[in-house]
Curated annotation (Swiss-Prot):
One of its GO terms (cellular component) is extracellular space. PROSITE patterns: THD_1, THD_2. It is found in: Cell membrane. GO terms for molecular function: cytokine activity; tumor necrosis factor receptor binding. A lipid is attached at K19, K20 (N6-myristoyl lysine). This is Tumor necrosis factor. Glycans are attached at S81, N96. Residues 89-234 form the THD domain. SMART domains: TNF. The gene is TNF.
Length: 234
């Protein structure tokens, strides 16, 4: 039934009842009926507007034609993304704690991995396919006190490309944990100096990547996960 039909029926009912009602009692009844009719019409009109403009009614799921629905569970989305990229080359190697005095990378430790063609040869990661890669590495230095000569710590990631076979630094950082010498007789306080580097690069199949430092004797192996090197295909 439309809103106009409802209003017309209410008006007809008012005319019939107003003819039958008489005197003060009839006027009072007519007034109550008019108020009730007004509220009924107002309510019906409001309900019609809400239904017409879709303010109330069944909920419709918003979906994007080029992507997952907005109410899709996050876990399911992450799982699908992980499955879609499971065939991409990836590697995460950690420092070999059994090789003191030098930075040697290993892939047989906990939390280390190599997958989908990445190889570790001669302390270098070998790229299996052309593409964009995220390259990252972190080292942590530790020492006690500061020497009389300046102490500089460097961390460098280099690339040897198959196309020109020349070692080129693609990421490099330098830090100095000591700003002045520890006075003679003073307590040698410990210091820590982390260096993290990362960037995205276009690599070719067969490229070799290395992560090196200049002061391996200051490396801190006290905790696992402090010194690592890795690549992820994007």
């Amino acid at each position: 039934m439309s809103t106009k039909s409802m209003i017309r029926d209410v008006e007809l009912a008012e005319e019939v009842l107003s003819k039958k009602a008489g005197g003060p009692q009839g006027s009072r009844s007519c007034w109550c009926l008019s108020l009730f009719s007004f509220l009924l019409v107002a309510g019906a009109t409001t309900l019609f507007c809400l239904l017409h403009f879709g303010v109330i009614g069944p909920q419709r799921e918003e979906q994007s034609p080029a992507g997952p629905s907005f109410n899709r569970p996050l876990v399911q989305t992450l799982r699908s993304s992980s499955q879609a990229s499971s065939n991409k080359p990836v590697a995460h190697v950690v420092a070999n704690i059994s090789a003191p005095g030098q930075l040697r990378w290993g892939d047989s430790y906990a939390n280390a991995l190599k997958a989908n063609g990445v190889e570790l040869k001669d302390n270098q990661l070998v790229v299996p396919t052309d593409g964009l890669y995220l390259i990252y590495s972190q080292v942590l230095f530790r020492g006690h006190g500061c020497p009389s000569t300046p102490l500089f710590l460097t961390h460098t990631i280099s690339r040897i490309a198959v196309s020109y076979q020349t070692k080129v630094n693609i990421l490099s950082a330098i830090k100095s944990p000591c700003h002045r010498e520890t006075p003679e007789g003073a307590e040698a306080k410990p210091w820590y100096e982390p260096i993290y580097q990362g960037g995205v690069f276009q690599l070719e199949k067969g490229d070799r990547l290395s992560a090196e430092i200049n002061q391996p004797e200051y490396l801190d192996y006290a905790e696992s996960g402090q010194v690592y090197f890795g690549i992820i295909a994007l």
